[in-house]
Amino acid sequence: MGKQCEVCGKKPQVGHHVSHSNIKTKRRFEPNLQSVRHQLPSGEVKTVTVCTRCLRSGAVTKPVVRKSA
């Protein structure tokens, strides 16, 4: 999948670079995406690409890491 959050669907937006002389050229604002391991309600662990807002809001639950003795 491209540069898109798998939870909220956030995608790149288009804007402009604006120079000192006010010349505008196109640019892209990319979302801050991170690949994290997500634990599904069934207990399955899957790697998903999510934006940092979804991570901070708790939309993604990380799996519990258990230390072996």
Swiss-Prot record:
One of its GO terms (molecular function) is structural constituent of ribosome. Disulfide bonds: none annotated. It comes from the Bacteria. The keyword Ribosomal protein applies. SUPFAM superfamilies: L28p-like. HAMAP family: Ribosomal_bL28. This is Large ribosomal subunit protein bL28. The gene is rpmB.
